[in-house]
Regions:
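Short coil-to-helix segment of the ABC ATPase nucleotide-binding domain corresponding to the Q-loop/switch region
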Residues: 95-102
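Conserved signature/switch motifs of ABC ATPase nucleotide-binding domains
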Residues: 134-137, 155
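ABC ATPase "signature
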Residues: 220-221, 229
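Conserved ABC ATPase "signature" region
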Residues: 65-66, 102, 106, 113-130
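ABC ATPase NBD coupling module
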Residues: 67-83, 112, 226-230
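Helix-to-loop junction immediately C-terminal to a conserved catalytic motif
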Residues: 50
Length: 327
């Protein structure tokens, strides 16, 4: 495991209980989206991973080492393998792009000749070689975040922490930054933790996700699993799943989940042909995830109890997830 959080509690001096019994693992090469509403504990959680904050109790293991047991110099060295980017970029306004990236290497005591080549390599990676002499005030928000990404990768980390890294950007720039991060993750084989309140970020970038609410992880799994079968009420809210059958009685109203391999199949048509029922489609949509697409239909079955049951068994036999909706 690249990251292991074990039995984490975080209580501030004012008595606020920010994190409660948090256990979390991140495997090598995974991109984990941590999503929740404001005040849920997301930023506290990510700052614990590199010990910018320390827990009240529990263990923080990164690359197999408990960071809480390290001396200050040992912790500083361990942090070099953990890159981090923030919502507001945190660039030094008096330094140009080249100098901002080089600064991380100077702190780590790289040789000057190696700093030159490394910075050029990083700026090429993020597409900013032609901006190396620009100052932050001359850059757009997306360009500033690209500088921050280059700086975070300076010391060749294997773990990248992103704290609301796209929240200050417009949707087009957000997409370009997520595309960049996805490419960098694959090229460098990084493990990534991405804190966000935007479900679109999780859909576009992540293969794993967890949902945090009031300091607790309420749901954890692959993005595909959670989108297909969300269990917690907060997860359903974040995914935009509401009372999709409106004012209709919930009797015989179901939500059917279609995974990628079933999206192009005429399943509803086959259902009507096979069984003595009609199917009324109430709503439907398709979510495009980074791993595979997932389709949803909310339908009402019009027919006898026996035929409806046979239709449900048929859908289950196909491997589809079917949930009866409640009022």
């Amino acid at each position: 495991m690249v990251v292991e959080l074990k039995n984490i509690e975080k209580i501030y001096e004012n008595g606020f209980h920010a994190l409660k019994g948090v256990n979390l693992e991140l495997k090598k090469g995974d991109i984990l989206g941590v999503i929740g509403y404001s005040g849920a504990g997301k930023s506290t959680l990510i700052r614990l991973i590199n010990c910018l904050e320390r827990p009240s109790s529990g263990e923080v293991l990164v690359n197999g080492v408990n960071l809480l047991n390290l001396k200050p110099k040992e912790l500083q060295k361990a942090r070099q393998k953990i890159g981090m980017i923030f919502q507001h970029f945190n660039l030094l306004s008096a330094k140009n792009v080249f100098e901002n990236v080089a600064f991380a290497l100077e702190i780590a005591r790289w040789e000057k000749t190696k700093i030159q080549s490394r910075v050029h390599e990083l700026l090429e990676l993020v597409g900013l070689e032609d901006k190396m002499h620009f100052y932050p005030k001359q850059l757009s928000g997306g360009q500033k975040q690209r500088v921050a990404i280059a700086r975070s990768l300076a010391n060749c980390p294997n773990l990248l922490l992103c704290d609301e890294a796209t929240s200050a950007l417009d949707s087009k720039t957000t997409h370009s930054i997520l595309t960049l991060l996805s490419g960098i993750q694959k090229k460098l084989d990084l493990s990534v933790v991405f804190i966000t309140h935007e479900i679109e970020v999780v859909k576009e970038l992540c293969n794993q996700m967890c949902v945090i609410s009031s300091g607790e992880i309420v749901e954890r799994g692959s993005v595909e699993e959670i989108f297909a079968n969300p269990k917690h009420a907060v997860t359903k809210e974040l995914l935009g799943i509401k009372n999709e059958h409106g004012d209709q009685k919930s009797q015989d109203v179901y939500r059917i989940v279609f995974l990628g391999e079933h999206l192009d199949e005429p399943i509803i048509s086959n259902l009507i042909k096979r069984f003595k029922i009609d199917v009324s489609i109430i709503s439907g949509n398709i979510e495009e995830l980074t791993t595979k697409d997932i389709g949803y239909l909310v339908v009402r079955f019009l027919g006898s109890v026996a035929e409806t049951q046979r239709a449900l068994e048929y859908l289950n036999a196909l491997g589809l997830q079917v949930e009866k909706l409640k009022d």
